Each structure stands twice: as C-alpha cells, then as structure tokens.
C-alpha cells in the first residue's frame, strides 16, 4: 500500500502539491487499494472468534427488535380499523347472540354451517354463548359463515327496501317480516338466492363484508344490553398497552445491542492493539525503519479506534438494516401489494441521490485524512523547530505554509459538508413525497372499499422503515472506506515478516565460557543497500577486557555494536557471544547477558528508582544506590527532595542530558550483566565526571567484558584493545601505544584531540 505518509507532500516550497493533484493521486491509490482494504477488514474478523457467542446474541436481539418495530404499525392499524372504526369488534363472530337472531342467520346457512355453529356455541336460556376453546381456524370459518348470513339478514330485514320488495313480489300482506317469509320458502329457493349473493360477494371488497358483519354484531350487543363503548375502550387500551410493551422491548433490545456491540468492539480493539504491540516488539531495526514511530503510534491508536468504531456501528446498523428492510417488505406485501410500486419509486430516487452525492463528494472525502496528516506534519515541524524559525526570522514563511495547509483542509471539509448537507433534506423530501403519494393512492383505495384507513397508516410506517434501512446502510458506506484504509494499515504491520527470529533449535552457551565476544570476518550491509557498512571485521574480547571502538563519523561504530545484541543479522561471517553464534541463541538469552547504554539516553516515565531497576526489578535498594554511585548519579539524586523516588517524566525531559546518560549507565550497572555495551554514552559528561565515572566503572566491571564506542580518545586510553574503524574497515587494532606507533588514522584522531604533552 502507498501509505498515507507517502501521499503527504513534502514541506519545502518546491514540492508543494495542490489539492487537485493530491485528489487525483489519492483517487488512484484508493482505487488500487480498495480491494486490499476489504480483504484486510475481512482478515481482521478472525479476532471476533472469541466473541462469537456475543455476536449470536446481538443478532437474536436485533431480530427481536426488528420484530417489535415491525409490529407497531400493525397495532396502529388495528387501533384505527378495529378500535375506532369497528368499535373494538374484531370480526363477525359474536361472543353472544339471541336465539331469534341465530334462527334468522341459519336461514342463510347450509347444514354444514349450521352444524359448525351449533358445535361452537352453547345455549343458555334464550341466548347462545361462544365456547372459550375454539381454534383460530374454526373462528375464521365461523367468521366466513356469519359474514354472509349477517349481510343477508341485514339486506332482508323488515326495514330494508330489498325486504319490502320481496314481500310485495311474493304477494304477502304489507308488514310481513321478510325473514319469516324466507324461512317458509323451500330450501332450493333460498340456496338459489345464496348462489346469487355469493356471485356478488366475489366482486365485493372484503372490508365492506367485514364492516357489515361487525355492524350487525354491534347491533346485536346493544340489543343484549352490552356496553359497546366499553368494548371499544378496552380494545384500544389493551392495544395501547401492547404497543407500550413492544416499545419497552425495543428500548431494552437497543440498549443491550449497543452495550454488547461496544463490548465486542472494545475487545476487538484490545486484541488488535495487543497484536500490534507484540508484533512491533518482535521487530528488528530493519522493520522499525520500514514504519516510522509516528506511523506505528497512529496505527495502534487512531486506526484501531477507527476499526473499532465501525465494527460497533456495523453490529447495530449493518446487521439491523437488512433485517428491518426485508421484514418491512414482507409486511408491505401482506398489507397491500397494490401500492408496492410507490416503494420502488422511493428506493430508486434514494439510490440516484446517493449515487450523485457520492460521485461528487467521495473523491474529496477520501483525501480528508491525507490533508489532516499534512496539516499535522506542518504543525509538528513548526512547533519542534520554533527556535530555528525565530533564529532565521522565518515566522512569516512558516505562517504562510501553515495557512495553506489549513486552508486546503478547510476548503475540502466545507465542500464535503456542503454536499452531505443536501442528503438529509433530499431524503426528507423523498420520504414526505412518498407519504403524500401513499395517502393519495390509499384514499382512493379506501373510497373504493378495497383498503382500510389503518392499513394506509401502517403502509406509510412500513415504507418509512424500509427507506430508513437504506439510509442506515448509506451512512455506513461513508465510514467504511476510512475503516478499510485503517484495516489495511493495521494488516500491513501484522503481516510484516520479522527478519530477526529465534532458531527453532536454539543452542545454549556453556557455563564455563562467560563474557566472551568474537567477530569472525564480519561484513554487513543494510537491507536494500548496495555497499557494505562493515567489511571483514575480526576481533575477540575475553572476560574482564575492555574493548573500545573509535573512528570518524559514519565509519560504522554504532552499526558494529548493534550486531552484538542482534538488532541486525550479519551479511557475512559470524558474531559469537560465549562461543555461540548469536543467530543460534534465543534473543532473550542473548540480551539477558548484555547491559546496553544507547547513544541517546532513554528514560521512562516513573521514578529514578524504577528507571534504575528497569533491567532487574528484584534488586535491593542498596544495589540501586550502588549502581547510582558508580554512575556518578548520586551527585544530583541526593539534591532532590524525594531522592530516588523523584519523578521522571516521559523521555526524561525533566533531567539534563548528562543526568540522563548517568541514569542510563546506572540502569545497565544495576542489571549486573556479563557484557557492558556503551555506545558513546559519555559524550554529555564533563571531563571531571567522565574521569570519575571511568575510574569507578573500571573497578566495578573488572569481571565483565566492556565494549565502548567513543569519540573522545581520553575516554578509551586505558582500553585493552582499541578498534579503529575507517569507512567500515578495520584500520587498526591494539592498545593506545601500539596504535600511536602503527595506525595513521588513529594518529590523526589523537593529534586532533590531545596536546603534544598528552601524546608524549
């Protein structure tokens, strides 16, 4: 991947890159890495295996939430249709009816229907009561039987025009009950009338049949003295309570999903950070140079946070949106399929709006992080370089640089935000337009009797839920590209092959050999470098000896000692410690033998005591004090009020350079290793402290091997062997006197630093 660091333009004026050029460059990189980013995101999913149970629970809760969400419009529909329009009476099956009414209804029933009614009703005096244990299927059959019969009874009632016309047609006296006349007719004649009614009912909307039956039942209840208003209120209240219960379940499910999603995403972030940390800790110097420190920090914090946030949202939105959308479509088809074309129009318009906005805004959106990185880079350079900027009076120039980076980011942010501000108003316009269109079409359906008002209201709510599911997925599609980039950057670290690895069959040094170092014809070249930094270096140091390395800047001194702790592997030859090739030992066993003091003293946040104990936490307070005394650190430690418990800030910024070096030396001494390595670790000390330290150190380390890299000859005059490096080659090896006699390079260094009296 072309890392974001690489896309950030250089800060010099000659290499300033315009936003337009940066947009094109990032687009090409984005297209090239989009597939790899998706693959990286999928690879990171393996970290979710630990949370498989939680994920199953999340999916179950989302189904529960969606079920309740999709049930609410249905309850709203029932409150309007049944509770308000039908006075709380759900169908044409009366709970109770008079014997006379049943006899009238049975006129229009066949023998099977009469039998089914008699089986499911019990006569009590002059009324019939519905049994409590009837099945849903039986109730549906009874509803169908009663609906037709009730329509016929209403149609041929004494007050109806149709009933009076039939009486006149049959030549019966005026005032004769039409139903009494029908009861006296032959069964064949009644069945003929019923056949004609069935033909008409086929073309009649179901809602009209239902309304007729419900009206009949309501009239019957009133005749029996039942309070229909109480039935209506009870139905509305019970439906309202069920809706409140559904809303409570939705709330609890949503809270649970959010909580569990945050937990799963948090565990994912924790595991990713741990994996990155363990991977980075296994890096050799070669891998450290591949990734900058700032980049590794960003990858283990911001990038992990980006993936973590998207994963939490993915559980709540990406999984929920399809469940809600598909469920909404099923509910719509069950409600009324004649208006589904409206949903097709709405979804089409939404997709067009999203496509246009993404085409316009996405190229700018994808470079936002790059522009932020560029602003951070400029800010960091300015803040760290303030003394130099002031010294050269370049404040105005740096202000212009910062202003340009800031303006580029601001313009791009404004452009993206302006584009995105159009999304919600357009979506609201589409949603409101869909609502108007549904109401318009639904009004015609209600007028024609093919649909009820409650169904229209439910259809609107289902349509909004389907549209919202598309909006949720759209919102995620904005965040996913950034998460993919973050996942790819994390994956780059995790899949990096570590060049320095322990041998599968490690060799352990003999206890009889300690503190021995041997370079056997060692040559070394940095990865991807054409020339050797070190060539054919050979020497041997035994226990108790002091080996010094000196040479001009860039001669390979630090590189040479970095081969001992195996920060790099040699290109040719071998480095042996205690008679074993360092490549055959485990890194831990090798480094446990070493006490390393780097060129730049590194301290950790904590106290002076914790820093000295860093290599060997179990040492006593007396050993801590002894290490500080040898390192000449007690001079400033004793002046502090808290002495060894004095705080040390991150990086040791609250101590001077010389104090930092002395504490670093004390840390190595406290470890009591077999081999001490000092990489120009006395450079920040004055001559007096340097002399006292070398004297104390020589006494303390007499049983250990000491390797010293130095710039000052005065530091290494007493060394048992001095190795002189010149452009990666050994120009000489021996004591100070031997080198003064036969090594020209050493002589030049000595004459440049020492007076004639000191040389004599």
What function would you assign to each model-found segment?
Residues 24, 84-91, 98-105, 110, ...:
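Short intracellular "coupling" helices and adjacent cytoplasmic loop segments at the cytosolic face
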Residues 327, 331-348, 352-354, 359, ...:
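Helix-loop-helix
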Residues 1-72, 76-243, 249, 253, ...:
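Membrane-integrated ABC transporters
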Residues 2-5, 10-11, 15-18, 24-32, ...:
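ABC-type nucleotide-binding domain
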Residues 257, 282, 289-318, 340, ...:
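Extended hydrophobic secondary-structure segments
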Residues 56-67, 244, 248-252, 256, ...:
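Generic alpha-helical transmembrane segments of integral inner-membrane proteins
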Residues 175, 186, 193, 285-286, ...:
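An intracellular "coupling" helix at the cytosolic face of ABC transporter transmembrane type-1 domains
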